């Protein structure tokens, strides 16, 4: 969290008027599953900090967060059918039952950067993970 806070604090001084800061949290920030306490705590703190900072830096600059759900990245080192089974298990109850792709998260980030009327909010790019059936 201190890394986020320092980057935002010092970065905001160098962002041009009308500029934007985008943070990345994660879906567990608002729905913690067993084993996700650290991830949930940090993500929630990042989103709370973003909302507080939005009030401090407006209207000169905007700040938002993007919250990815399960994303297919090289971070998951499991390969082949085992990888497919892992993603299926993690996303089967999502409204969109698949892992997202990095470019889909990038599109969410571009949205909050490019839309001048969005500030102090979190955009979920999670395939409906937060609304899934338990």
PLM features: residue spans?
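Conserved SDR Rossmann-fold cofactor-binding beta-strand/turn motif
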Residues: 62-72, 124-126
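Catalytic loop of short-chain dehydrogenase/reductase
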Residues: 1-6, 13, 17-58, 70-71, ...
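C-terminal substrate-recognition "lid" of short-chain dehydrogenase/reductases
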Residues: 98-125, 130
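Conserved beta-strand segments that form the floor/walls of ligand-binding pockets within enzyme
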Residues: 23, 95, 124
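Rossmann-like NAD(H)/NADP(H) cofactor-binding core
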Residues: 22, 64, 121
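A glycine/serine/threonine-rich, flexible loop-to-helix segment
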Residues: 70-93, 132-134
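Short-chain dehydrogenase/reductase
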Residues: 8, 46, 50-51, 106-109, ...
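Conserved loop-to-helix N-cap of the C-terminal "lid" that shapes the substrate pocket in Rossmann-like
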Residues: 65, 84-87, 96-106
């Amino acid at each position: 969290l201190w890394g986020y806070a320092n980057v935002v604090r010092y970065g905001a001084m160098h962002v041009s008027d009308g500029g934007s800061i985008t943070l990345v949290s994660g879906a567990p920030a608002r729905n913690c599953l067993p084993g996700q306490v650290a991830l949930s705590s940090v993500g929630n703190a990042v989103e709370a900090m973003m909302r507080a900072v939005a009030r401090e830096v407006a209207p000169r600059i905007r700040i938002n967060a993007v919250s990815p759900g399960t994303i297919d990245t090289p971070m998951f080192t499991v390969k082949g059918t085992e990888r497919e089974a892992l993603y299926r298990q993690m996303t089967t109850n999502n409204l969109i039952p698949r892992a997202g792709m990095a470019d889909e998260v990038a599109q969410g980030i571009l949205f909050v950067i490019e839309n001048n009327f969005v500030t102090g909010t979190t955009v979920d790019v999670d395939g409906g993970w937060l609304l899934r059936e338990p």
